[in-house]
Each structure stands twice: as C-alpha cells, then as structure tokens.
C-alpha cells in the first residue's frame, strides 16, 4: 500500500503546480517577496507608510453551489473569477485596495489540467483586481468527495487609510442610492437556481432568445469585480458614504449592513430593467417577488450611498470604469431597513 493507492497522487499535485505557474506569475506585484512554492506568501507593506493610519481589511468566501454547473458543463475557466470577486468586492465595500489573494481547492481527485484551469480563472480575477495571487492549497480528498468534484474558496487582504474607510455612519436622509449592474446571478442563490432549472448538460446548453445565450452561459457568467470602479470613484475625488455588495440575502439583507440607525433605503424597482435571467427564474420557479429580492442581486451587484451633489461625478466614474450605473433610490428617515416600491 502507498499514498497513491489510497487515493492521493503526489505527482499529480506537482504537475498541477507546474501547469499553473505562469498564470500565478502574471498576477505578481512588486511588493511580492519570494517565488512560488514557499510555505507562506510574503508581501512588503513598505508602500503603505505613505498612509496616515493604514488599516488592513480581509475577506473570505467561496462560490457556493455554482460549482455544480461547472461540473455539469465541464467548464472550469471562470469559476476562479467568482472566488476572487466574492472576496475583493467585500474589501472594496470598506474603501480598500486589494493587495493579495490566496485560494483553496478541495477535490476528490487531482486532475492537473483541470486544477490549472481553475487557478487560471483565479489568476484572471486577481489581474482584474490588481492583486497578487501569493499562495494557495489544492487538497485531494479521496473518499470524502466524488472524484470529478471540487470546492473552491479564497481569502483576500486589502488596505485603506483610516480616513478613507467607508463605514456608512454619515449616511443621512436625502442621500442618493446608486446601483451598479451585475453580470447576472453572480455566486449566490444557486441552491434555489438548481431547484428551479433542470441541471443537465442538455438543458444548460439550450439557447433562449430572451437571454441571448444558453441557460448555462447566463448562469455561469462570472461575478463582476468592482475594484476598478471604486478606484475610479476615488480618483474622481468622491468619498462614498456607504457601499453594499449584493450577495446572499439580496437587497433586504445586504443594503441594511451599510446603514446607521434611524434611516432606511428606499429603492425604486422600476429605476432599472431587471435582467431576463431573474424573470425566468421567478416565472419558472413560481418564486414570489419578496423572495427574489431576498435571495438574488436582481441585476445590481453593488449599491452606493452618496451625497446628492456627487451623483453626476459618481455616475461618470462608474461609466469610465466600464460599468453601468443607475440611480435606484434614496435614503429616508425611519427604521433601519429596505423598502422596495
């Protein structure tokens, strides 16, 4: 008996690392110290001395059961983008700049080419976020997971000067809410998605005129990364008052997380066009409206609270970053929460 016969292929692990090296190298920043393969990733903080009071920020998350679609479609090149997005978008909600990222893949069996493809997606997410992929782990779990399946999670660290920290504490009645478009379902609510739609290769490869693509393409579209967007807003000289990443729990759970006591967010549902994938989900799954807005992002991946005087500047900055903004509502006095009207 040896380790390979028990289900763990060390040589496959070595091959995976070799295949992913170029992708990982493409994410490096000058602050990264050392090469690939060390016991820990090293990142110099010398540059943050320029900040008055640097604050480190962290975020960790995964892709949930969205990975099931990747298994069925045998498409693994974008799921890594989702893992990065879920973490760095949380970091930018506090006004931070992502510095580095680490990934964790647990798999039933290490197929080097597949693992390298997944990490290639992670690297792409890191490039979009301008953060370095400085470490990771691929763990083979024979007997615990099916051979063809895996789970993917990540961890991001960022930094912000304390004076630039977005806390939401200064949000007040009269402030404007700006929503930034999502790419679709992003990485939340997929357990419900998988209950609504038949999850077979045939069904996912079915083209729908209403979507302008196949169902699988619509669902597997990678989560938007809003790092560049927030940098553009900051470069424009605007201090965002509050920022919410619309993930699991939708508007109802996430928008209140940025609000102080005594104010509520009033969001106008007709202020933007809800993408067709959500309409299809609601109709095919007979899902009530409140549940839709309490589960999915409904086409809005990020919600900002800004001073009315800054609205035009923020809208232009978001567009300059290549994203689509909408004025979706305002802040009113009342019990902390969200009202959709």
UniProtKB/Swiss-Prot annotation:
It catalyses: 2-formamido-N(1)-(5-O-phospho-beta-D-ribosyl)acetamidine + ATP = 5-amino-1-(5-phospho-beta-D-ribosyl)imidazole + ADP + phosphate + H(+). Disulfide bonds: none annotated. GO terms for molecular function: ATP binding; phosphoribosylamine-glycine ligase activity; phosphoribosylformylglycinamidine cyclo-ligase activity. Keywords: ATP-binding, Cytoplasm, Ligase, Nucleotide-binding, Purine biosynthesis. It comes from the Bacteria. Gene3D superfamilies: PurM-like C-terminal domain (3.90.650.10), PurM-like, N-terminal domain (3.30.1330.10). Its main location: cytoplasm. InterPro entries: PurM-like_C_dom (IPR010918), PurM-like_C_sf (IPR036676), PurM-like_N (IPR016188), PurM-like_N_sf (IPR036921), PurM_cligase (IPR004733). One of its GO terms (cellular component) is cytosol. One of its GO terms (biological process) is adenine biosynthetic process. The keyword ATP-binding applies. Pathway: Purine metabolism; IMP biosynthesis via de novo pathway; 5-amino-1-(5-phospho-D-ribosyl)imidazole from N(2)-formyl-N(1)-(5-phospho-D-ribosyl)glycinamide: step 2/2. Its EC number is 6.3.3.1. It is found in: Cytoplasm. Belongs to the AIR synthase family. NCBIfam families: purM. This is Phosphoribosylformylglycinamidine cyclo-ligase. It comes from Lachnospira eligens (strain ATCC 27750 / DSM 3376 / VPI C15-48 / C15-B4).
């Amino acid at each position: 008996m040896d380790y390979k016969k028990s289900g763990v292929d060390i040589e496959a692990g070595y091959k995976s690392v070799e295949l992913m090296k170029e992708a990982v190298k493409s994410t490096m920043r000058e602050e990264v110290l050392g090469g690939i393969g060390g016991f820990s990733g090293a990142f110099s903080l010398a540059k943050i001395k320029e900040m008055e009071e640097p604050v480190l920020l962290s975020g960790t998350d995964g892709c949930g059961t969205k990975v099931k679609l990747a298994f069925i479609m045998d498409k693994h090149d974008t799921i890594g983008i989702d893992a990065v997005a879920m973490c760095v978008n949380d970091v930018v909600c506090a006004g931070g700049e992502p510095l580095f990222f680490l990934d964790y893949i647990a798999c039933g069996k290490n197929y080097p080419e597949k693992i390298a493809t997944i990490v290639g997606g992670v690297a792409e997410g890191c490039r979009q976020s301008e953060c370095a992929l400085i470490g990771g782990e691929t763990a083979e779990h024979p007997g615990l997971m099916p051979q063809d399946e895996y789970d993917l999670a990540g961890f991001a660290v960022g930094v912000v000067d304390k004076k630039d920290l977005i806390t939401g504490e200064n949000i007040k009645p009269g402030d404007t809410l700006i929503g930034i478009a999502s790419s679709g379902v992003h990485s939340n609510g997929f357990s419900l998605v998988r209950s609504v739609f038949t999850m077979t290769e045939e069904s996912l490869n079915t083209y729908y005129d209403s979507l302008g693509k196949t169902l699988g393409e619509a669902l597997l579209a990678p989560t938007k990364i809003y790092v560049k967007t927030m940098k553009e807003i900051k470069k424009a000289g605007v201090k965002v008052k509050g920022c919410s990443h619309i993930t699991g729990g939708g508007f109802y759970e996430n928008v209140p997380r940025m609000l102080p006591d005594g104010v509520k967010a009033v969001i106008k549902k007709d202020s933007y066009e809800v993408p067709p994938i959500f309409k299809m989900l609601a109709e095919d799954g007979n899902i009530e409206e409140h549940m839709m807005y309490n589960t999915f992002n409904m086409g809005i991946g990020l919600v900002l609270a800004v001073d009315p005087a800054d609205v035009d500047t923020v809208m232009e900055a978001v567009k300059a970053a290549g994203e689509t903004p909408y004025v979706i509502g305002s802040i009113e006095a009342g019990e902390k929460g969200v009202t959709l009207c």
